[in-house]
Amino acid sequence: SIYEHAFDIDEHYRSEMAERALILDNDPRRYLVMPHMQAAAWDALQMLMENLAIDYPQWFSLVRDGDRWHWRNHLLQIDQPFIFGDAASLPCAPLEYIGRQVQGDFALLDQRDGDLYMDAGLVTSPADWSLAFDAGMSFKQWHAPVPMANQMGVFDRALKYLLNLQAGQPVRRLNWTLTINPRLDSSPETFHQWGADRGRITAQNVGQQVHLRVELQVMARLPRSNAVMFSIR
């Protein structure tokens, strides 16, 4: 069930984390946190660590003593004491640190002036979009390429709904698209690696090459920063 756990960990965990590490090493632009989003990054780290420790106690544990936290990830052999709020106490910035240990992509949306702005995130397996390109865009701006939906008022209603998300009441939705080959990273940055495959589809191979890509999207209000965390799994 998609409602069983807040964030899903499955049998592909280690391989997907290894792939994420390679992508981040080759293209650091897949990670972004604007200066005003530091509190949101710590918010996201807390939400992810707490939920992983609750839902998968055999793999993750979190012990807190005030601002002194101790995180253990048994799947990746990580044992990390740190001070919450002090980035220098972690091997890397907080969103990147926890993002390297959780399956799925994460965007942090700053809410201001009656809109949501994509001002932070860690995205290594997008379906035809780019965090580096969308950085700083408003909700409607980054959805502009979606055909017909804006004219139908879909994004007006979606934005109104998301602006009213309450802390502690996350919402989930499923999104789907068609993709060529079972590839997670179909970003514009890697188009030269996979784009030509679209022109090779024939009536004879369509059944083997075209895949239904289904994404579980979770939208949650972060309590300290009031940002919205948008996860895509």
Protein language model features and the residues they cover:
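Extended, well-ordered protein cores
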Residues: 1-233
